[in-house]
Amino acid sequence: MSVTDKSKSRLSLVLVIGVFVVPVILAKLALTNQWFNEGVTNQGALLDQPLDLTELGVNTDAIDKQWLIIYGLPQTCDEKCDQTLFSINQSYLALGRETPRVTPVVMDPVGTHQALITRLNQQHWQIQASSLQAKLRVLPSQIYIADPLGNVMMIYPRPETEQQFKQFSKDLLSDMRKLLKYSRIG
């Protein structure tokens, strides 16, 4: 065997091994460095630390094993707060036949929003008073999703601009539809 034949056979061997090894190495690098987030379909942020409804001060006796959309009201409910409540309500109503499986919940800090609460009671909302413990855990102006087992699993920041409000409603509706579609509980 000549030198050129040996170098050709070695090159062929290296190429054959490379064809199988290089994609594995690239895939490992892509996963560890998070180059691709194409597999993520949720719009809200998943919570890193587990959070229980009792830690938020939610009275679970008033809610019968349903999915919850929880909104922590700020101290003063301005126009953005009203628009957030409207967006949550519209997303809730857009669920259609799935609405009996979902309950929107408002966490009211020390009962300060009576006029707002009387308006919401007509729309199938649960109003819960926030305790001091809940105030420490619930960020005001944040929207949470909780499963029927009482685990808070997803969080959304309150939108600030008109475009963000439109996107927020679509995102919340999309996530709720997926959760309800694949849920075997509640």
Show which residues each predicted segment covers.
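Short active-site neighborhood of thiol/selenol oxidoreductases, capturing the structured segment around
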Residues: 62-80, 88
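Thiol-/selenol-based redox modules, centered on thioredoxin-like
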Residues: 153, 157-186
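Short acidic, S/G/P-rich loop/turn micro-motifs used as interaction or catalytic elements
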Residues: 75-80, 111-113, 160
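Conserved helix-turn-beta segment immediately C-terminal to the redox Cys motif
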Residues: 85-105
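Short extracytoplasmic/periplasmic juxtamembrane "stem" segments immediately C-terminal to an N-terminal membrane anchor
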Residues: 41-59
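Short, internal strand/loop/helix patches
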Residues: 103-105, 115-149
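A short, hydrophobic beta-strand/beta-hairpin element that forms part of a small beta-sheet core
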Residues: 88, 141-159
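Hydrophobic membrane-insertion alpha-helices, especially the h-region
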Residues: 10-32
